[in-house]
Amino acid sequence: MQRYRQLSQLDKEAGGILIGRILLENENFIIDDTSEPMPTDTRKRYRFIRTPEGHQEYFNNIWQKAEGRCFYLGEWHTHPERIPTPSSIDKKDWMRILKLDFESDILFFLIVGTKEIKVWYGQKKNKRIVELPRRD
């Protein structure tokens, strides 16, 4: 994800999906992998639209290698700002994703800024999205 930071004025937003595990013993989440931008994605300076093509195949490949022991855990994308904040479009998209059917009640949303990565999580049952506090 870091290699897609928008450090120059010409860099376009990038993004992908988060893939990982949910530990049964403590319900902790581990993000093991991420997809990278695909040729079918829309990438502009201030907009990224992920298409299913490519990302789904990438997930399927990881799922087979993990013998079905991995899950879709959310989305990531970049912003051309030092400390990223979600746009109204981001928030709407996250709420739309939360309404879809996934194994987990919680999904994660990462935005990679030029200096920091910020993380939010959303819960299906209460339809809330909350920023995870940064631990230094």
Set out the residue ranges of the language-model regions.
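Conserved beta-strand-loop surface patch within small alpha/beta domains used
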Residues: 1-72, 81-136
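Histidine-centered divalent metal-coordination motifs
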Residues: 77-79
